[in-house]
Amino acid sequence: MNNQSNHFTNPLLQLIKNVAETKNLAIDDVVLCLKTALAQTYKKHLNYVNVEVNIDFNKGLMQIEQLFDVVDDNNEDYDDFLEMPLSEAKKLNPNLEVGGVLRKPVSLKDIKGDLISKMVLLFNQKINETAFKTVMSDFINEVGQVIEARVEDIDTNKDGGLKGYIVNLETTKGYMPKRELSKGEKLDIGKKYLFVIKEIQKQSSMWPITLSRSDSRLLEFLLNSNTPEIANGTIEIKKMERSPGTKSKVAVISKDPVVDPIAAILGPKGERIRGISEEFNGEIIDIVIWNEDKLKFLVNAVLPAEVVGYNILQDDERDTSIEIVVPANQIANVFGFKGINIRLISNLTGWSSVDVYTEKDAAEQGIEFTRVNFQPQGIFGIKKRRDKISNNPRNNNQQLASDKVFYTSKANVVDDEIIVDLAKQAEAKRVKQIKQEATKPELQLQQELNLEATPKVAAPTPTPAPQPTPAPTKVEPVPPPVSVTPKPIPKVNKPKPVVKPKSVFSITVEADDSKTKPEKSSAKTNTPQTKQTFDNFDDL
């Protein structure tokens, strides 16, 4: 038999190696794809119906043969694509007999022109199919799992706009489309991020693994990782809804009555929930107490706004709809920025429609509603913290004790320590003001008598002039006016020391229209501002 072998060229050898490394495939798999592509190209485009391709990668040899069945010369009906008369076959191999198989060598030179492009296209198709099978076997059971991976490249369109990100998964590549990003989020090449393996596409010419950072399972993973009480099963996440990058609502329940689920998820000074929020570009995360009763669950989900009343629509078409009545100054908070908050509430609680009215609007439209006669869940620590402030003699602003300040289950409100810190800062500012005011009478008196300022020491027989209000305690002693015997002390109208400080809490309290609004304070704290939660739609 006259065999002809084609030696590999160095570029072809290198091509096989590169494809194997890039697609994370074995050399034998790549060789098999090449053999299949060559054989199909010969059969389809050169009418070489029965072709066999043999490749020895280690020796760098390739053998392509066309196979013919040997038939008797008297057979006039033979198929010249598959069969060859004995006389013709013996010219190529004298040892053949009828019924044998002739192997006729084929040269690679027969593949030329546009056939090369078609063969390469077919080869790439076979490579992708093989790579997909490998990926499927490795990742099919990982769908829904969270992985940490590095962003390798950015995929852009013709105009340079973002299409998505190419992510290195070590054994293969993953792809995250732009739609799977959180709102306003941008990823950096070379940096590691957390991703959810969202799906594996069966038909993909590039990256079959689709990744996501907007999937709710990523939020669930972070809550579980950062909250030991969730990890050990004490707190259970019942349901969650997300508007990625803007706001989320998470319904939870505690299996231990001693464990407050909201406080546990917030963590000390809100550190736990703050870290999770930063992972999603500052996304607001509301923690809601789950309740099997849909009405009570809805009232919990509306917090920190108050549901005054409700009307469940019983007609057949909207049997799961409800109308709720809230105070006029809270209706904007219930809707939220672009209606995001009310959509999350509706989806979370399972009501097909939640219509919101003020009492005035409900009356004008003739809506009869039932008053809410139960206490919503999710106001953790309110009584304890309110009493701390209202019973503290240092704080004269009674508006601090209103429910409006702490009536919330929002994740950006922290625990008692923040309230104590605010009180300390208020006291420090007040002491500073009193010190400044207390020195004014002495300086004015010295100017009247043309006396030099004297050190602050106690006089033997102090006779201070009567004050409108007593000086506060724990303040450095202020010397009384100097007594002069030769002539009477001129009467000086002393300014009243300021006793009532400007409340640092005025930034978080919305005063009623009938009351005087407290003055704004310049005090700065690290505590998230409740007013922003209520009034700033961009933060909802």
From Swiss-Prot:
Q: Name one GO molecular function term.
A: DNA-binding transcription factor activity
Question: SMART domains per the record?
Answer: KH, S1
Q: Does the record carry Transcription as a key word?
A: yes
* Known partners and oligomeric status: Monomer. Binds directly to the core enzyme of the DNA-dependent RNA polymerase and to nascent RNA.
This protein's species is Mycoplasma pneumoniae (strain ATCC 29342 / M129 / Subtype 1)
Per the record, the GO terms for biological process are:
DNA-templated transcription termination; transcription antitermination
The UniProt entry's coiled-coil ranges are none
**Any one of the GO CC terms:** cytosol
This chain belongs to the protein called: Transcription termination/antitermination protein NusA
Q: Where do the S1 motif domain residues begin and end?
A: 144-214
**Residue ranges of the region described as Disordered:** 457-540
Q: Where in the cell is it found?
A: Cytoplasm
Sequence ranges of Polar residues compositional bias? 523-540
| Keywords, sorted A to Z | Cytoplasm, RNA-binding, Transcription, Transcription antitermination, Transcription regulation, Transcription termination
Please indicate if the UniProt record lists Cell membrane as a keyword: no
Q: Where is the composition biased (Basic and acidic residues)?
A: 512-522
Pfam families found in the cross-reference section: KH_5, NusA_N
- State the function annotated in the UniProt record: Participates in both transcription termination and antitermination.
Q: Domain named KH: which ranges?
A: 319-386
| NCBIfam families named in the record | NusA (TIGR01953)
Report the sequence similarity comment from the record. Answer: Belongs to the NusA family.
Q: Which residues lie in Pro residues bias regions?
A: 461-489
